[in-house]
UniProtKB/Swiss-Prot annotation:
Transmembrane segments: none annotated. It comes from Paracentrotus lividus. This is Small ribosomal subunit protein uS8. GO terms for cellular component: ribonucleoprotein complex; ribosome. The gene is RPS15A. Belongs to the universal ribosomal protein uS8 family.
Length: 130
């Protein structure tokens, strides 16, 4: 079976494993976008570390969960988000201003909405987690 959206499948696996109180989850196939998205989640402490296993096929990622993640998801299609519309998107996607992050792909790489605001760049929206 061909997966149309690898990032959506990966985040759905993580969310389902978190709901079942699992400590680890296996994600396959892996992609560069999925790895960068997981790096943003690690930076903010929502998941533990992960390991990429290259099996010369699609690749696998083993993610250690720490029980802090409530929900994560992908926004499809990837809408353009200028800097002045960033507040509107964060208020629509996140439950509160105190926690949660919207992940964007920008010209400076994949980053969360706070870092994009600090660097004063807009981009396309990938997903969210809180």
């Amino acid at each position: 079976m061909v997966r149309m959206n690898v990032l959506a499948a990966a985040l759905r696996c993580i969310c389902n494993a978190e709901k079942r109180c699992k400590r680890q989850v296996l994600i396959r196939p892996c992609s560069k976008v999925t790895i960068k998205f997981l790096m943003v989640m690690i930076k903010h402490g929502y998941i533990g570390e992960f390991e990429v296993v290259d099996d010369h096929r699609g690749g696998k990622i083993i993610v250690n969960l720490n029980g802090r993640l409530n929900k994560c998801g992908v926004i499809s299609p990837r809408f353009d988000v200028p800097i002045n519309d960033m507040e509107k998107w964060t208020s629509n996607l996140l439950p509160s201003r105190q926690f949660g992050y919207v992940v964007l792909t920008t010209s400076g790489g994949i980053m969360d909405h706070e870092e994009a605001r600090r660097k004063h760049v807009g981009g396309k929206i990938l997903g969210f987690f809180f």
